[in-house]
Amino acid sequence: MNQEDNTGGGGIFGLFKWTKXALFGTDISPSMKYKDQEERRDRSRYAQDDTNFSMKFGNDSNRRSTNLSRSNSWSGLDSTLHRKYELLPEYNENGFNSIVNGDHHSKERIRSLRSPAPIVPREPLRNEPTDTFGHRLHTKRRTINELSNSQIPFIPPQEDDPLLSKLFNKDGVNEVRRSPYKLSVKDIPGKFPSPLTKRDEIDNYYVRDEDACHKNREYKKAYFDLFAQMDLNSRDLEDLCEDVREQREQFHRNEQTYKQAYEEMRAELVNELKKSKTLFENYYSLGQKYKSLKKXLDQTISHEAELATSRERLYQEEDLKNFEIQTLKQRLSDLELKYTNLQIEKDMQRDNYESEIHDLLLQLSLRNNERKDTSAGSNIFSTGQYDRTPFHNGNNSYDSNSHSWDTDYLKKYRRIHRTLKQKS
């Protein structure tokens, strides 16, 4: 019994622990957890663990609900959407608009179709007096300062809470105080309800009356109902796990498909990038060639301009040279004419000279003949002196004192004499 007190599994310490949990909302009541589960047979409503009751519920408009539903293809299909996209409204079997006519079942059906099936129940918890744990913990919006405070906030119970009123009844408390035995965990409400079993440790201290038997039967019925509901919940949980497993397998298949498509798209993108790189390189090389050709064209144009200038200059120089050639030709012709005239004049002078020489030779021969007659047997070319006729011709002159001929005249005379001998 002392060990049970130390561990807090039962007795007065267990009662104190349950009272603290009932007052300050540190846990959830199993009776509230599985309450009204027979009415909610839909798969979207499950009896979940304590996390379902960690939301903020209530009718206060300032409170923000954490029940977020997923969006699907049915979301937003209200009258505003029908008017916006010019859609026909939904009609019931009688041909009237079910939403406009206020058909509650049609509204619920459409609302259930428009919203996906949530794992967490969407209906807010009712303000039941037996909910002494999780619901009261989250009915008040607690700030960060309150959460950071080490002290446990004081939350008073409801005034019309029959469970707490019965729990803190003076007769019951006095009875517990008078009892030499400590209460067990099974006797404390708020935990899993179970039939009252016989306590062997109590030696016929308390005899159960008919009310206790009736309560025992009610506990058994509720207990079996809870087991049946737990069985249904277990089946639904298995179905949910199966659905989750199938969705996970489908997710893996989709992931493999997306991965393969990503690899193919990535390979295609790499090929496109390579082609783009090759195209850019070709475009760059073509641009360089275009620049070089344009530069060569500019150089060619400049060279052509220079060539045209050079050609014009050459034409001018050619004209100048032609003029000089014409001038030189004219001068040459003049010189040739002058040379011809001089040659003719020279020939005439030579003829004159020859005629004079011939006359002189005749005179010389006549004188020689006369001398032969005067001096017989004498030779005009002997070693003795002989007279020479004075002859004046330009620069050739005869000196009367020396009786000698000019040297040039003698040379010319000898040449003429030689010519005459050859002719004869």
Curated annotation (Swiss-Prot):
Write out the entry's keywords from A to Z.
Coiled coil, Cytoplasm, Cytoskeleton, Phosphoprotein
Chain intervals with Low complexity compositional bias: 64-75
Q: Among the entry's GO cellular component annotations, what is one?
A: spindle pole body
Residues bearing PTM Phosphoserine: 29, 73, 115
Record-linked InterPro entries: Bbp1_C, Bbp1_N
| Keyword hit for Cytoplasm | yes
Q: Where in the cell is it found?
A: Cytoplasm, Cytoskeleton, Microtubule organizing center, Spindle pole body
Where is it mostly found?
cytoplasm
How it assembles, according to the record, is:
Homodimer. Interacts with KAR1, MPS2 and SPC29.
Q: What does this protein do?
A: Component of the spindle pole body (SPB) required for insertion of the nascent SPB into the nuclear envelope and for the proper execution of spindle pole body (SPB) duplication. Connects the central plaque of the SPB with the half-bridge. Required for proper localization of CDC5 at the SPB and for proper M-phase progression.
* Protein name (record): Spindle pole component BBP1
Q: Which organism is it from?
A: Saccharomyces cerevisiae (strain FostersO)
Which gene name does the record give? BBP1
